[in-house]
């Protein structure tokens, strides 16, 4: 993991088209601004992990249940 120090209003670039800016620092909370192309999905990690888990559940759907749905 690369660890960088930034102060309020300082930025860093990820690749050529993603800019991360430190907006505010209050105690142990840091507000971050992101500029990225619209085709780049940005999620908080905890939400991203939930999405992955739901996708795994959907991919392992009960075959018997699916078969009964399609026979209707």
UniProtKB/Swiss-Prot annotation:
InterPro entries: CsrA (IPR003751), CsrA_sf (IPR036107). Keywords: Bacterial flagellum biogenesis, Cytoplasm, Repressor, RNA-binding, Translation regulation. Its main location: cytoplasm. SUPFAM superfamilies: CsrA-like. GO terms for biological process: bacterial-type flagellum organization; mRNA catabolic process; negative regulation of translational initiation; regulation of bacterial-type flagellum assembly; regulation of carbohydrate metabolic process. GO terms for cellular component: cytosol. One of its GO terms (molecular function) is mRNA 5'-UTR binding. It comes from the Bacteria. It is found in: Cytoplasm. Pfam families: CsrA. A translational regulator that binds mRNA to regulate translation initiation and/or mRNA stability. Usually binds in the 5'-UTR at or near the Shine-Dalgarno sequence preventing ribosome-binding, thus repressing translation. Its main target seems to be the major flagellin gene, while its function is anatagonized by FliW. Belongs to the CsrA/RsmA family. Homodimer; the beta-strands of each monomer intercalate to form a hydrophobic core, while the alpha-helices form wings that extend away from the core. This is Translational regulator CsrA. It comes from Ruminiclostridium cellulolyticum (strain ATCC 35319 / DSM 5812 / JCM 6584 / H10). The gene is csrA.
